[in-house]
């Protein structure tokens, strides 16, 4: 139903956000956090 779709959308957004943060910290480890 609609509620399940909303939960899926939110989960997708959260997953994207978490993946982005993980990617950033990974980059940070590799490059030595140079901005």
Swiss-Prot record:
Q: In which tissues is it expressed?
A: Expressed by the skin glands.
Q: Name one Pfam family in it.
A: Antimicrobial_2
User: Can you tell which superkingdom this protein's organism belongs to?
Assistant: Eukaryota
> Kinase among the record's keywords?
no
Gene Ontology BP annotations: defense response to fungus; defense response to Gram-negative bacterium; killing of cells of another organism
Q: Which UniProt keywords apply?
A: Amphibian defense peptide, Antibiotic, Antimicrobial, Disulfide bond, Fungicide, Secreted
Chief site of localization: secreted
Disulfide bond residue pairs: 28-33
Q: In which compartments does the protein localize? A: Secreted
GO cellular component, as recorded: extracellular region
Keyword Signal on entry: no
Q: What family is it from?
A: Belongs to the frog skin active peptide (FSAP) family. Ranatuerin subfamily.
Describe the task this protein carries out: Antibacterial activity against Gram-positive bacterium S.aureus. Shows no detectable hemolytic activity towards human erythrocytes.
For this entry, the protein name equals Ranatuerin-2SPa
Task: Give the source species.
Answer: Lithobates septentrionalis
């Amino acid at each position: 139903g609609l509620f399940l779709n909303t939960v899926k959308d939110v989960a997708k957004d959260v997953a994207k956000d978490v993946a982005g943060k993980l990617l950033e910290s990974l980059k940070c480890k590799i490059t030595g956090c140079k901005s």
